[in-house]
């Protein structure tokens, strides 16, 4: 997947699930299932309920995403 094809949007973590999966509510009100990107996992960045995050989504599947940044 080319970098130009991703959609970046901000959201808020609503629920944590097993296997580093999260339910994220986007700014537009939709809820998606998101997983943690490799760099966040490698650097042991903790993501908790209520955190504001940036999510990358593929234009082909708008129900799933990848968390790429956690705001402080």
UniProtKB/Swiss-Prot annotation:
Record InterPro entries: NA-bd_OB-fold, RNA-binding_domain_S1_IF1, S1_domain, TIF_IF1
Superkingdom per UniProt: Bacteria
Entry GO CC: cytosol
Keyword list, A-Z: Cytoplasm, Initiation factor, Protein biosynthesis, RNA-binding, rRNA-binding
Function: One of the essential components for the initiation of protein synthesis. Stabilizes the binding of IF-2 and IF-3 on the 30S subunit to which N-formylmethionyl-tRNA(fMet) subsequently binds. Helps modulate mRNA selection, yielding the 30S pre-initiation complex (PIC). Upon addition of the 50S ribosomal subunit IF-1, IF-2 and IF-3 are released leaving the mature 70S translation initiation complex.
Similarity remark: Belongs to the IF-1 family.
Protein name, per record: Translation initiation factor IF-1
